[in-house]
Curated annotation (Swiss-Prot):
Residues 5-91 form the Acylphosphatase-like domain. Keywords: Hydrolase. The active site is at residues 20, 38. One of its GO terms (molecular function) is acylphosphatase activity. The keyword Hydrolase applies. This is Acylphosphatase.
């Protein structure tokens, strides 16, 4: 298993429901690096970097999110890894 990088856009009721904090907790649990932030259009953007199976697991989590979230769509773009360290919330 190699290191991969996924760029996500998550749509639905994903702001004001603890999505970023919950994603950070899940990422740390899985050992995935990257970042997450809210966007002005109401969506959430995230970059996930780590072992493929762990990144895939976090993408799977993103389709549900925390209990108060209502995810309607997740767009995933695969990119070249850039060496992210840790997982942070931006903004």
């Amino acid at each position: 298993m190699g290191i991969v990088r996924a760029h996500l856009r998550i749509y639905g009721r994903v702001q004001g429901v603890g999505f970023r904090w919950s994603m950070q907790r899940e990422a740390k649990k899985l050992g995935v690096n990257g970042w997450v932030r809210n966007l002005p259009d109401g969506s959430v953007e995230a970059v996930l970097e780590g072992e493929e199976e762990r990144v895939e697991a976090l993408i799977g989590w993103a389709h549900q999110g925390p209990p108060l979230a209502r995810v309607t769509r997740v767009e995933v773009t695969w990119e070249e890894p850039k060496g992210e360290k840790g997982f942070r919330i931006i903004g």
